[in-house]
Amino acid sequence: MRAAIYNPYLDTLGGGERYTVAVASALVNAGYKVDIEWKSKSIKKRLEERFGIDLSGVNFVRDIKRGDGYEVCFWVSDGSIPVLRARKNLLHFQVPFHDVGGRTLLNKMKLFRINKIICNSHFTKEIIDKEYGVNSVVIYPPVSVSKIKAKRKQNWILFVGRFSQLTQVKNQDVLIKAFKKFSKEFTDWELILAGGVEVGVGDYLEKLKKLAEGYPVRIIESPSFKEIVSLYGQSKVFWSAVGFGINAKKEPEKVEHFGISVVEAMAAGTVPIVYNAGGYKEIVADGETGYLWKKKRELVTKTINLIKTRGLLIEIAERTKAASRIYDEERFEQEFND
């Protein structure tokens, strides 16, 4: 049996790409010979290092011919509907595209060849279904929760996310500004910003470094999966400002579509305090498995309350670890292969 995979964003090494390699792994485990379309085979090592997934059973080829000759084709959409030719065609939306003319007659004709449309969250599904007139299914991304363990905790606040300024910005500058206020009282804490710098960074990284001058802020560029796991294990709190300042109804693509890094942090007992928008609301139960915030001052005040309230950090950390287990890889493979 042969399976084909296409993702035009592979070299960005983000959450959607983590989803893609998990699909490849699931197909290999199901007995398929898997081909991923990409212009260079060197991407394989980069994907393995970033996501900690063995891709030894996966081939990288220049053209999967839109699934022609394959039993299964998994295609990550860039907003368009492709003409796919495999026996079974799966179309995946990792971005909530809107106002792209999704209901044209041509798209409706192309959709006849699609067996299943998969979204990464209910947030994405709601927008995709409305835009294209379809009924997609939600399969949450897989998270390597069994590989992520709590270690001896340090006074670290962590954020993991790309530094790219393309499409969806991660707002690391907002986190630095909030940390400056936080550190006036908590001088022994450190903010760590870790993420990929491969695509679309421009001069943003230098601006962040200048903004952080004089404060205990550490920036880690393109860490490996092993490094990220270590950071999760030692950090006490996870911050995110993705979606801040964005009108989610007008620009849903700019808020967090799911939030794999939040689940990874939770697996390590690192308490998330994340912006109240998009997929984050499906992951974090406010006050139970972390906190959601809307105004910048809430990010700081909720963090201070978490730290100062005796026993609260440990209590919520235990709940986050339990909550993260529903996103494990075994669950993903079962749902994907159904």
What residue ranges belong to the model's regions?
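Glycosyltransferase donor-sugar binding loop
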Residues: W38-S42, E190-E206, E221
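Donor nucleotide-sugar binding/catalytic pocket of nucleotide-sugar-dependent glycosyltransferases
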Residues: N115-K147
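Conserved donor-binding/catalytic core segment of Leloir-type glycosyltransferases
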Residues: I118, K149-K170, I176-S183, L191-I192
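Nucleotide-activated donor-binding/catalytic signature segment of Leloir-type glycosyltransferases, i.e.
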Residues: L205-S230
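Acidic donor-binding loop of glycosyltransferase active sites
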Residues: G233-H257, T270
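Short hydrophobic beta-strand element within catalytic cores of glycosyltransferases
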Residues: V262-A267, V271-V274, V284
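Conserved acidic donor-binding segment of nucleotide-sugar-dependent glycosyltransferases
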Residues: D286-R297, N305-G311
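A charged, aromatic-enriched C-terminal amphipathic alpha-helix characteristic of glycosyltransferases
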Residues: K294-E298, G311-D338
